[in-house]
Amino acid sequence: GEQARAALSRVIAQDAPIVLLDEPTASLDIAHQELVLGLAGSLARAGGAVVIVLHDLDAAATHADHVVMLVDGQVAAAGTPAEVMTSEILSRVYGHPIDVIDHPVTGRRLVVPSRSRRD
């Protein structure tokens, strides 16, 4: 986690117009994940281009302006999170049922794998 935060700090200090981040939140707790993704959003709103590789579909649905889903190195879907992050598309891409629901209070899109408890 500390290495990821230090690397992100170096990227910000360089004031690069394009930022490429590969799984920047993978080793972070939830609070730091939100901090990093919020910071990336701030960089984008300030005019920078930010490309982030994420496997956390819920975080991508929340923070991304545009999503590109790859399967075997080929683009399987591209568009806004609302266009791309649907149960149908995600389930096809991942080969596993995925639920996409709207939060009952905030309306924010929630992406979770369908799971059944095995007793």
List where the protein language model places each region.
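Helical segment within the ABC ATPase nucleotide-binding domain
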Residues: 33-46
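H-loop/switch region of ABC-family ATPase nucleotide-binding domains
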Residues: 54-55
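A short, surface-exposed alpha-helical micro-motif characterized by mixed small hydrophobic
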Residues: 60-62
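Catalytic Walker B motif of ABC-type/P-loop ATPase nucleotide-binding domains
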Residues: 19-23
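ABC ATPase nucleotide-binding domains
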Residues: 93-119
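ABC-family nucleotide-binding domains
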Residues: 29
